[in-house]
Amino acid sequence: MKLFFRQFGLGKPVIILHGLFGMSDNWVSIGKQLSEHFAVYIPDMRNHGQSPHDDVFSFSAMADDVLELIDDNYLGNVTLIGHSMGGKVAMQLALNHGDKVGRLMVIDISPGKYPVRHSQQQVVEAMQRVSLTGITSRKGIEDQLIYSISDFRTRQLIMKNLFRTGNNTFAWRLNLEAIHHNMDRLFDSVESDSTFGKPVLFIRGGQSDYINNDDREKILKLFPDATLETIPHAGHWVHADAPVELLKIMNDFMILK
């Protein structure tokens, strides 16, 4: 699949993969700052943003999409960065095609299996319940979402997925049906018979429970050269909670290591 992507800067290639319900827009600020030293590519994953929709929605399929982006742009020795769902895809790609990836950075996700989180399922169902017919203002949509999604930040993340149609109403950029039907897959473990022995950095938010100390064994089994850093005051959305600290860690890992 040909993914929509944004590109900034020149130099060694860096690809940033967003998480579930996200899009390339969410990483533009950090991407532009990284582009002072690197050529940064930020795609919209399948079923997100401006990329095509498809019923198939798995880590392997998404990894193949990113591989196609790498090959189409004649990239090599890529630094691959992924947050949450994007981190799982980045891990899968590094394990499947380690010759294409020079180093890997995974933000607030482990390779292990997670129980399906009620909050994620609730978000999809809340979006599916929204009536977009005749709604011409974002407030009209937020007024419907607020009853199911009380957290302001989550609502704002979701609202970024709206776009105006030709008749001045709204539609979702997300493929809600595909996400809903494949939700279990998005919490599966990353599976591979191989390992990725190049430098890997896992970054976790200290206020998040997505990576805990018990995950270390799973991480090192697949990524024997992995290290872990914690940003104490950050939650799961590390790039929103601690952009300055995250950017410093990124640059240190990519430039100094």
PLM regions with names:
Residues 28, 32, 41-81, 248-251:
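Active-site loop/oxyanion-hole signature of alpha/beta-hydrolase fold enzymes
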Residues 82, 86, 90:
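Gly/Ala-rich beta-loop-alpha elbow adjacent to hydrolase catalytic centers
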